[in-house]
């Protein structure tokens, strides 16, 4: 097919007009995007961030310097000591001990003790990171709120908090949560013997903590008798409210009978692997009898095991009713422990926002 010169010119003009329209539309899109970007910058300005801040010039950095300048640290009964304990929920001496533990075992990571990182930027000091962890645990601050008082970024605060919780449990769980032996066990039994419960060394119960942001597809699995998704923990304490054993988190739909089967401490006591040689004397039908083994006080939702004594719910016997009232009046140690923890650390009192804060 042969085209004439006029046809060829007409086709070139049509192609040129199409190209010019495409270029014009592209220019219009650029102008519209520029206007939209300018509007976004005008309505939501981004504040410039100092990528190498001096953390010691922050409010909490000045606080650490001021308290460290006091010889021997602030006294617990002094104004500064009371103010520090009220704001960060622990005495200043305990805070110094935690800082020393973090430096010794590197709870905040391998580079936490260094002053500068590989890019020659100032690393946030361990003292300020420890204050941020205490504030999050004690007053349930958000991670972005920490930046206002420490000049520390939200990502750094989140990473420091999770590293501390994970590493602290790994290194120091056995140092604070351990099974009593010898003299300590005898002293614990003496306390309960004076209350009329020979052979008892503590009480156990389960704590259900609300999980607010539970996925919808897991609501039924994690919801129990409370009516909302929760995380269940089993805990055993003595009369002085020292924790003897605890478990990790379980589904909120599980009851106390199921959770206690996974408690290693209770299982060992039941199977006579620990405290099997401990003996005490009680009256059985008027005869003084020596019994071996120990037991714990619990509520009526547990198994009828010999190592777990609970009050009798339905009885017509006067002696059984008096025994149940006596046990109920002394079964307050584990409940008081939960109350003390919630009062000291507000992060335990409120709901659990994310599952990543479970250790």
Question: Language-model segments: what does each one mean?
Answer:
Residues 126-139:
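Short, amphipathic alpha-helical "recognition" segments used to contact nucleic acids or chromatin
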Residues 115-119, 129:
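Active-site-adjacent structural elements in folded domains
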Residues 92, 126-127, 154:
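Alpha-helix N-capping/helix-start residues
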Residues 122-123:
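Extended, leucine-rich alpha-helical cores of fungal transcription factors
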Residues 142-359:
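Short, well-ordered secondary-structure "scaffold" segments embedded in the functional core
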């Amino acid at each position: 097919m042969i085209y004439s010169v006029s046809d060829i010119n007409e086709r070139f003009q049509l192609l040129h007009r199409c190209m010019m329209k495409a270029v014009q539309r592209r220019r219009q899109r650029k102008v519209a995007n520029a206007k939209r970007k300018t509007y976004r910058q005008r309505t939501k300005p981004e504040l410039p961030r100092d990528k190498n801040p001096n953390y010691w010039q922050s409010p909490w950095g000045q606080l650490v310097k001021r308290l460290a300048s006091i010889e021997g640290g602030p006294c617990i009964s002094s104004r500064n000591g009371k103010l520090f304990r009220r704001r960060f929920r622990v005495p200043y001496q305990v805070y110094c001990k935690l800082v020393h533990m973090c430096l010794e075992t590197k709870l905040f990571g391998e580079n936490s003790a260094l002053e500068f990182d590989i890019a020659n930027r100032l690393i946030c000091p361990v003292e300020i990171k420890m204050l941020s962890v205490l504030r999050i645990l004690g007053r349930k601050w958000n991670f972005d709120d920490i930046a206002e008082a420490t000049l520390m970024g939200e990502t750094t605060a989140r990473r420091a908090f999770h590293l501390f919780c994970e590493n602290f449990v790994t290194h120091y769980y056995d140092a604070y949560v351990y099974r009593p032996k010898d003299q300590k066990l005898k002293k614990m039994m003496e306390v309960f013997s004076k209350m009329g419960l020979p052979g008892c060394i503590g009480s156990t119960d389960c704590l259900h903590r609300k999980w607010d942001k539970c996925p919808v597809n897991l609501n039924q699995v994690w919801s129990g008798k409370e009516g909302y998704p929760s995380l269940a923990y089993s805990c055993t304490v003595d009369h002085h409210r020292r924790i003897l054993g605890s478990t990790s988190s379980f589904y909120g739909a599980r009851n106390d009978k199921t959770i206690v089967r996974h408690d290693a401490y209770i299982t060992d006591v039941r199977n006579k692997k620990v405290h099997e040689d401990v003996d005490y004397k009680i009256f059985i039908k008027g005869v003084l009898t020596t019994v071996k083994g120990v037991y714990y006080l619990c509520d009526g939702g547990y198994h009828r095991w010999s190592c777990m004594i609970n009050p009798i719910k339905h009885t017509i016997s006067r002696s059984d009713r008096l025994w149940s009232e006596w046990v109920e009046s002394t079964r307050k140690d584990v409940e008081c422990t939960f109350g003390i923890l919630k009062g000291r650390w507000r992060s335990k009192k409120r709901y659990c926002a994310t599952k990543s804060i479970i250790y």
